[in-house]
Every structure is written in C-alpha cells, then in structure tokens.
Curated annotation (Swiss-Prot):
Site feature Lowers pKa of active site Cys, where: 134
Key words of the record: Acyltransferase, Cytoplasm, Transferase
Top-rank taxon: Bacteria
Additional observations: In the reaction, the free carboxyl group of octanoic acid is attached via an amide linkage to the epsilon-amino group of a specific lysine residue of lipoyl domains of lipoate-dependent enzymes.
Keyword Nucleus assigned: no
Protein name, entry field: Octanoyltransferase
C-alpha cells in the first residue's frame, strides 16, 4: 500500500460533509489503507482554522462561516478553486509534518511552472505566492500519524469574497488566480497537480474514482 494512491474527483460539494468524511476516513484507516487525495470544488464558504480569530472576519454577508480543525486561519473556498485534500500515512512515507508542507508547496510551485509561472513559498505565511500575491492557501491536520485537509489553489473564480476577510490573518493580503496569468481549465490543472504529486511522493500505482468515500 505504501506506493499506491487513490484519487477521488468529487466535483462540487458543500464543505462540511467532505470535512466529516475526511475525519471518518482518518479514524478508520489502518496500516493497510492506501493513501488518498480528494479533489473538490466547494460551494461558497469561509473556513476558520484553529488559529483563526473573529476579527479577521470583516463582512461575511450571506456566505456561511465554518469552524474547521485544520491549521491556519481564515480562508475562502468557492467554485473555480481547486481544493486537494491529502489523506497520507506520514509514518509509512517516513515524512514529518514540515516535510509534507514543503512537498505540498513544491507541488504547487512545480504545477505553476508547467504554465511558465514563477511562484514561491514564504517562511512567514504558509502557501504559494506569485509576485507577493497569494495563489494557494494551505492548512493541514495530523492525527494518528496521518494527514488530512490540504490546499486550495485559485484557478478561475470570483476573488471578491476574499475582500470580506483578512486571508490567513493578514490584513490587505492580495489574492491572485491562475486564469489571470494563463488560460487554463480545472481539469488540466488537476492532471498536472496529480502528476507532480506522484513524482514528489513516489507513488507507483494510481487509481482514479468519482465516488465519494463511504465509511459503512
């Protein structure tokens, strides 16, 4: 199972049911469970991470706010943003948390390079940035030596809701999206992202599914 990966393409989903399913998957997995990556677009939602503060919610309006258990502070998810959840057995992969964060940042940097876009991580604020504007947010949780939660990469979306918050706790943090820099589709980016992940984390066997995780 160490080198096997299942990628679930879940389409457009509300945040809370997917979050609950990640918990169930992580609670029930054991040393024989293969790693999974879930690709999803969420309906509009603000999520507060464990370090989130109420004062960073400026004017949420009609968009719901969900208190999440991932690391980090507040962010926005919405249609046109690629969310990838990494359900990885870190002990089996012999990875530390910081190593996984670096791998995920590099995964996005390599994916953007595929489109001739130069980007970088920042030591003071996890995520990936293009010319100091944030294109990808990152937040993880580790339980039983396994990761869940993941990244949110802005592809082709309405960025206006980010103005209603201090993204990741930074007032005035400017956001950017891939379609501002290069014409691209969600499907193309998914494909490149998974190829880069397989290379970075050394998976040898990859299977794709459009079925949601069912814990029963």
């Amino acid at each position: 199972m160490e080198n096997q990966l299942l990628v679930r393409r879940l389409g457009r989903q509300d945040y809370t049911p997917v979050w609950q399913a990640m918990h169930q998957f992580t609670d029930q997995r054991d040393s024989t469970t293969r790693d999974e990556v879930w690709l999803v677009e969420h309906n509009p939602v603000f999520t507060q991470g464990q370090a989130g503060k109420a004062e960073h919610l400026l004017n949420t309006g009609d968009i719901p706010v969900v208190q999440s258990d991932r690391g980090g502070q507040v962010t926005y998810h919405g249609p046109g943003q690629l969310v990838a959840y990494f359900l990885i057995d870190l002990r089996r992969k012999k990875l530390g948390v910081r190593e996984l964060v670096t791998h995920i940042e590099n995964l996005v940097i390599h994916t953007l390079k595929h489109y001739q876009i130069e980007s970088a991580a920042r030591p003071d604020a996890p995520g990936v940035y293009v010319q100091n504007r944030k294109i990808c947010s990152l937040g993880l949780r580790i339980r039983k030596g396994c990761s869940f939660h993941g990244l949110a990469l802005n592809i082709q979306m309405d960025l206006a809701p980010f103005l209603r918050i201090n993204p990741c706790g930074y007032a005035g943090m400017e956001m950017i999206q891939l379609s501002d820099l290069h014409p691209v589709s969600m499907e193309q980016v998914e494909k490149v992202l998974i190829q880069e992940l397989v290379t970075l984390l050394d998976y040898e066997q990859v299977e794709f599914s459009t079925e949601a995780y069912n814990h029963e």
